[in-house]
Amino acid sequence: MSLSHLYRDGEGRIDDDDDERENFEITDWDLQNEFNPNRQRHWQTKEEATYGVWAERDSDDERPSFGGKRARDYSAPVNFISAGLKKGAAEEAELEDSDDEEKPVKQDDFPKDFGPRKLKTGGNFKPSQKGFAGGTKSFMDFGSWERHTKGIGQKLLQKMGYVPGRGLGKNAQGIINPIEAKQRKGKGAVGAYGSERTTQSMQDFPVVDSEEEAEEEFQKELSQWRKDPSGSKKKPKYSYKTVEELKAKGRISKKLTAPQKELSQVKVIDMTGREQKVYYSYSQISHKHNVPDDGLPLQSQQLPQSGKEAKAPGFALSELEHNLQLLIDLTEQEIIQNDRQLQYERDMVVNLFHELEKMTEVLDHEERVIFNLSKVLEMVEECERRMQPNCSNPLTLDECARIFETLQDKYYEEYRMSDRVDLAVAIVYPLMKEYFKEWDPLKDCTYGTEIISKWKSLLENDQLLSHGGQDLSADAFHRLIWEVWMPFVRNIVTQWQPRNCDPMVDFLDSWVHIIPVWILDNILDQLIFPKLQKEVENWNPLTDTVPIHSWIHPWLPLMQARLEPLYSPIRSKLSSALQKWHPSDSSAKLILQPWKDVFTPGSWEAFMVKNIVPKLGMCLGELVINPHQQHMDAFYWVIDWEGMISVSSLVGLLEKHFFPKWLQVLCSWLSNSPNYEEITKWYLGWKSMFSDQVLAHPSVKDKFNEALDIMNRAVSSNVGAYMQPGARENIAYLTHTERRKDFQYEAMQERREAENMAQRGIGVAASSVPMNFKDLIETKAEEHNIVFMPVIGKRHEGKQLYTFGRIVIYIDRGVVFVQGEKTWVPTSLQSLIDMAK
C-alpha cells in the first residue's frame, strides 16, 4: 500500500521537493478533535511540520463550512493580485513599526456622506449561500405570487385605505419605491470611490455638514502639521490647569510647605549617576537636574534602549524648557498668593463689618445709658434740693418712696447698678429717723410696718436675701433697719419686764416678716434671752404667785431651742421645791403639767422618777387594805398622777407596794369561811379603780388573773365549800366573764386600729392630691394631739423649720431631721412621735 497521501500539501498536491515523512505520533489537533465524529481530515503541510503551532494557516483550511467538505466553486470570479513594485526592506520595516501606532487622519480623507454598503463576499461563497433560509434572492418580484392567487392581500390593503402608487400610512408618508442599491465602481473598500449614496437617499435624508464639526476636524489636522522626528505619530497630549485647580492646590500645599523636622534632617545617598552624591534632605533631590553625565562617551549615551534601531532624538532645548517651567511655576505661585491675599481681604471686610455692628450697638447702648443717667441725676438733685432746711416744699417719706419707685420702674438697670446705700443714707435715713421719733413699740406694735415693707422692696439687695450674716455695706435696707429701727427697739427692751411678755411677743410677731433674719436673731439672742435668763435665776417656785410657764411658754414659737439653757435651772429649782412635797398637795401637778410637752421625754421621765415616783411609792406603801373599812385617799393621790408619770412607772409602783398586800388580804379572807359574793364585789370594785391603759398592761393582767386562780382553788377545796351553795359556779362564771372581757378588749383595740387605718386609706383615696411626707407628719400629729406648725421666718439651708411639739424639725427629700446639740440628726417618724410625747 502506497503512503503517498501522507506527503500531500494543503491542496492535495504531492510535495516533490522534500522527502520528509509524517510522523505517526499523536498531535494536539488529534487530542482536541478526539470526540468529534464529523471532523475533517487535516493533512499536515510542510510549513506546519516545520513551525508547528507557529505556522501560518490558510483561512480556507482552518475554517470548514457547515456542510462538511466544500467543493471548489468554479463559477466564482477569478481573483487577481495586482502586480507592482516590491517595496524595500526599509520601507516594509517602517510600515511594520507604524502598524501599532495611531494613524493621523486628515479632513479630506473623510467622505462627505455615507450610503448603503454592499456586503463584500469572498469568491468561495456560492450564490445559493448569500440568502437566509426561507428567504428569496431578490426583492424585484415582491408580490408576484398574487398572480396565482385571488389577491386577498391587495384587497385588504385597499379596504384599509391604501392607494396604489402612494406610500403607506395615514398621511401616505411611507416610501413608494423600494430601496435602491448602487454598484461600486471597483473592488476597493467602502468610500474608496467617493460617496455611494443614491439619489433617493439624498432626497429622503439630506445631510448638512456642521460648521462646528468641520472646524473641530480642521483644528485636529492643524495640530498634526509637525512630524515627530522619532517616528512616533501619536498626538501630543496637553494638560491645562484652571485657576480653581491652582487655588485648591495652593490651599492643600499650604499645609505641606513646611517640611517635617525629621525628614528635613535625613541623609540621602544618590547612587543613580556615575558618581555617588550625598543630599541632606529629600527636598534637595527635587532640585537635581536630569542631564546626562559628562564622563560617559557619546556612543554609550546613544545606545538604543531596546533591540530595535535607535531613533533620532527629538528637537529639545532643556534650557528653554526649564525657563518655561520656571515661568509657569512663578505664575502659579502668583495666582495662589493673590488668591490668599484676596481671601484675607474678604475676611478682613467681614470682620470689620461685624466690629462695626458691635460698635454701633455699644454706641446706642451708651447713648441710652447717658440719657437715663441724666434723668436719674435730675431726680437725685431734686431730692437733694428739697432736703435743705430752708426749702419751702420739704421732701416727705411718702414722696421719697414714690421717687424711688419711679427709679426702680423706669430706670431699673441704672438703679440696680447705682450705689443705693449712699443714696439711701443721704436721703431716706433722715426722713426715717424723723418718722420713728415718737414711736413706742410696746404700745403700738404695728406702727411703721407698711412703710418699712415698701422700703424693703425698694432697697433690699436681691443677692442678699438668703444671706445669713449682716452685710451693712452692701444692702441699704439692712443698714436702714440696723441704724434707724434697732435703736428704738434697744431702748424699749431695756425698760421691758420679762414677766410681762405679751406686749413684747406681739411686737416681734408683727415685725418678724419684715425685718431681716439676722436682726431678729440679734434681738432674741442679745436682748430677750439675757432678760429671761436673769428673771429665771430670780424666780422662786415656793414664793412666786405667778407660774413660770405663763411668761416662758409664750416665747416658744419665736425662740424654740434658744430656751433650752433655761430648762435646767428651772428643773433644779422645781426639784428643790419638791423635797418636802407630799402627794396630798395637788399644786405640784398644776405647776409641772405645762412642762410635760416642753421638756424632752428623757429629761421629763428622769425628773418624775427622781422627784415624784418615790413620793408616790411612799404614799402607796402607807395604804392599808381593809375589806370591811377601806380608806381610798392615798390610792387616789397616786392614781391622779397617771397622766404625768409613765405607765411603766405606775405599774412598777403597783407591783411593789399594792398587789402584794392586796393578794395577801384576799388569801386571808378566803381562808376564814368567806362570803363569795362579797369577795366578788370586792374584786370587781378594785379592778374598776384602774384605767383601761393600766389594766391592759401584762403585769396588771397577771396579778388579777392570779387573784382569780386563788379564788377558784379556794372554791374547789372542800373546806368551806359546803357552807355556801352555788359559790363554785359563781366564781367560775366570774372567771369566764373576766377572761372574755379581756379578750373583747383586745379585739376591740385591734378593730379600732383597723378602722383608723381604713379611714386614713379612704381619706387618701378620696383626696385628689397625693399625700406627701409633710402631710403624713401632720396626720400623725393630729392623731397624737401634738402641735405641728411652721416656724415663722426660720430656715435651715433653705428648708422651712417646723415645731413638732417641743422639737424643731425640717424635712428634706422625705427625711425628717431633728435639731441636736451641735447638728441636725435624721430620725424615723415613730422616734419623732416618742420624742414629742
From Swiss-Prot:
Main location, first listed in the record: cytoplasm
Annotated positions of the Phosphoserine modification: 2, 59, 98, 144, 210
InterPro entries in UniProt: G_patch_dom (IPR000467), GCFC_dom (IPR022783), STIP/TFIP11_N (IPR022159), TFP11 (IPR024933), TFP11/STIP/Ntr1 (IPR045211)
Residues covered by the G-patch domain: 149-195
Keyword Ion transport recorded: no
Keywords for this protein: Biomineralization, Cytoplasm, mRNA processing, mRNA splicing, Nucleus, Phosphoprotein, Spliceosome
Record's subcellular location: Cytoplasm; Nucleus
Residue segments, region Required for interaction with DHX15: 1-50
Residue numbers spanned by region Required for nuclear speckle localization: 710-734
Comp. bias (Acidic residues): 91-102
Feature: compositional bias, Basic and acidic residues: 1-13, 53-64, 103-116, 217-231
One GO term (biological process): spliceosomal complex disassembly
GO annotations of cellular component type: cytoplasm; spliceosomal complex; U2-type post-mRNA release spliceosomal complex
Region (Disordered): 1-21, 53-72, 85-133, 179-236
Record carries keyword Membrane: no
GO MF annotation terms: nucleic acid binding
Motif placement: Nuclear localization signal: 700-705
Subunit structure: Identified in the spliceosome C complex. Found in the Intron Large (IL) complex, a post-mRNA release spliceosomal complex containing the excised intron, U2, U5 and U6 snRNPs, and splicing factors. Interacts with TUFT1. Interacts with DHX15; indicative for a recruitment of DHX15 to the IL complex. Interacts with GCFC2.
Family the UniProt entry places it in: Belongs to the TFP11/STIP family.
Function: Involved in pre-mRNA splicing, specifically in spliceosome disassembly during late-stage splicing events. Intron turnover seems to proceed through reactions in two lariat-intron associated complexes termed Intron Large (IL) and Intron Small (IS). In cooperation with DHX15 seems to mediate the transition of the U2, U5 and U6 snRNP-containing IL complex to the snRNP-free IS complex leading to efficient debranching and turnover of excised introns. May play a role in the differentiation of ameloblasts and odontoblasts or in the forming of the enamel extracellular matrix.
The protein, known as: Tuftelin-interacting protein 11
Species annotation: Pongo abelii
